């Protein structure tokens, strides 16, 4: 059975292109999620969405000698660090259609595809990936002194901020014992981070504490652990996010 590009449906979510190959008469439905990394002009393919077992097989293969050698050589040939040959989008509500293990397309075409026992699916997957790459050639036009943020970078940044937000929204101020994000006034819904410890305070309470200590000639100590601090940083999150 030959690959037929007319059977492709294309959509996108959060910088991820979703290719759905639907061949109803032959009972074939294949979903391939692809991220194009414009920093190194390459593609990352979600093997979890192709078949969840492939991700487990890949992780096991990567630990073997053959897998380690292949990853080392691919990293050398592409100039991409081994840690950047794979990316993971975690499973959460907003990512339910695109989550999974994304790996460099070379690994899919030359390694993972051979683990698929259905030769028809093999053929269609190869055709689908090659068709997408052939029709989505991208050459960045950015000055040499400009840093380009890739789609992978954007997703990792969003995930990082979502994680810290989920923790922050439950945190209580160590002085007033109110949940910081639930404070009545919007300007109070910020954290005051001390440079000396990790205790949690809303910006209003810690500023009042700081001002009172200065007015009375007392030293600037954390209200909880009494460790001396020098600076208070206003932050929307309970900790600084780099």
UniProtKB/Swiss-Prot annotation:
GO terms for molecular function: acid-amino acid ligase activity; ubiquitin protein ligase activity; zinc ion binding. It is found in: Host cytoplasm. It catalyses: S-ubiquitinyl-[E2 ubiquitin-conjugating enzyme]-L-cysteine + [acceptor protein]-L-lysine = [E2 ubiquitin-conjugating enzyme]-L-cysteine + N(6)-ubiquitinyl-[acceptor protein]-L-lysine. Transmembrane segments: none annotated. The keyword Transferase applies. Keywords: Host cytoplasm, Host-virus interaction, Metal-binding, Modulation of host cell apoptosis by virus, Modulation of host ubiquitin pathway by viral E3 ligase, Modulation of host ubiquitin pathway by virus, Transferase, Ubl conjugation pathway, Zinc, Zinc-finger. RING-finger E3 ubiquitin ligase which catalyzes the formation of both 'Lys-48'- and 'Lys-63'-linked polyubiquitin chains. Plays an important role in virulence by acting as an anti-apoptotic factor. This is Host range factor p28. It is an enzyme of class 2 (transferase). GO terms for biological process: protein polyubiquitination; symbiont-mediated perturbation of host apoptosis; symbiont-mediated perturbation of host ubiquitin-like protein modification. Pfam families: KilA-N, zf-RING_2. A zinc finger (RING-type) spans 173-226. It comes from Variola virus (isolate Human/India/Ind3/1967) (VARV). The lineage of its organism: Viruses, Varidnaviria, Bamfordvirae, Nucleocytoviricota, Pokkesviricetes. Its EC number is 2.3.2.27. InterPro entries: E3_ubiquitin-prot_ligase_p28, KilA/APSES_HTH, KilA_N, MKRN-like, Znf_RING, Znf_RING/FYVE/PHD, Znf_RING_CS. Residues 21-131 form the KilA-N domain. GO terms for cellular component: host cell cytoplasm. The gene is OPG021. SUPFAM superfamilies: RING/U-box. Belongs to the orthopoxvirus OPG021 family. The keyword rRNA processing does not apply.
